[in-house]
Regions:
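Acidic, low-complexity cytosolic segments
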Residues: 1-179
Length: 179
């Protein structure tokens, strides 16, 4: 999901979540502080917080910072029976949604590895790079995750299964595209 809420790449595996999941996710994340205050004022529990968002760099992917209580959405949360798990890397959200009960740490690690592999292949992880390498990104996702079950997430192991060449996007070009 792009910083404006646009879906860049979408792959459904189990079809157990609503079609408009990206819109719901982006609205929840963007207005997390307001949603949290509304839930507290109403006395309801519209979402269960599973963990605290951590945007520290992992394996060179991610935005530095984090650690402050700024009402940002946690990395994993539940809303109306749908589990939303995400990592944010260079302004791009890598998101997983499911109704199944799954280990948040396992899914978050998978999302970090997906972000790292895309960065390894494209040179940078940005909205522009993912858009220009959409076919390559779909091919990577198909090799890394099969019917919702993670397979290989190693860049070296994927090299013999990936046949598309990346369209190289310079970091200065992708930075201008983010403006």
């Amino acid at each position: 999901v792009a910083p404006r809420g646009d879906v860049i790449i979408k792959r459904e595996y189990r079809k157990d979540v609503p079609e408009n999941q990206a819109e719901i996710f982006f609205r929840l994340v963007k207005f997390w502080g307001a949603n949290e205050r509304n839930r507290n004022e109403d006395g309801g529990n519209g979402g269960v917080i599973i963990g605290k968002e951590n945007e520290n760099e992992i394996n060179g992917v991610g935005e530095g910072g984090g650690g402050t209580m700024d009402h940002s959405a946690p990395a994993a949360f539940n809303d109306q029976g749908v589990n939303y798990l995400h990592v944010k890397a260079n302004g791009v959200y890598v998101v997983a949604t499911t109704r199944a009960n799954c280990s948040p740490s396992f899914v978050l690690e998978l999302l970090h590895r997906i972000a790292k592999v895309i960065k390894d292949y494209c040179g940078t992880l940005s909205e522009d790079a993912v858009r220009k390498n959409a076919i390559l990104t779909y091919e990577l996702l198909d090799e890394m995750v099969d019917y919702g079950i993670p397979q290989s997430t190693s860049t070296a192991a994927l090299e013999k299964h990936i046949f598309n060449d990346p369209v190289v996007v310079s970091e200065s070009t992708s930075a201008l595209g983010a403006l």
